[in-house]
């Protein structure tokens, strides 16, 4: 079986695709599937149409049995050809705007199978099917999420012994991730021993080292699909404070050291205080395994879906 994975062009990453797409592809490869990648270049909706010829050339070269497009707009490029069956994964951005939702949903009806990374994304899609779909979050590569003993990690990173370090789950400038809410909550604590770090421009291994060293991972986000950064924090057994959006509450479960906060800065302050007082590691990694959200298991489910589609041809 040969599968071509498609996503939006991101020049700052290897193979010009978001890391989780590559990680999923490599996990699929372990199940005996031949995998290749195609990045949709250009800006704006028109680029998804104009890239059709480039995609057809890639199809001619690679001869895939199936195409798996990540994000609805990439799915538009994929279904502009009818030679190869298409699976499309919706991650969240498809439902954030009216026109994006309409376009992504409309073109998704031309795919053979839909994957939604969380139930709320299926619920929000304007046009949806009653069958040939699954709710399946992306998995976490436990081989990449390496746990380092906390004190060793802190020494290697040069962390100060009298500081409490919080890793914010995104770039400070990303308004959707909502750093101002975290800052407002921390300011209410009136503590000078807290330092917040930005998750930006870091490799998976760097993130794992920081998560192993940090006292807390914070994600006061306004909107998500099924957040990979949160799953990585869980896989590194880092205490977590996060808002109840998307599937976050389900992911965190009732694991000790996981705290759900509201959008009230006072509640954020209270949960941050509790998480810092927890002063231990969680069993988040066990929770990831319990949910079946390792990359290997998610890849196995995808290969089963691919096989079903090809057997119906």
Predicted regions and their residues:
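Aromatic "clamp/platform" in nucleotide-sugar-dependent glycosyltransferases that forms part
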Residues: 222
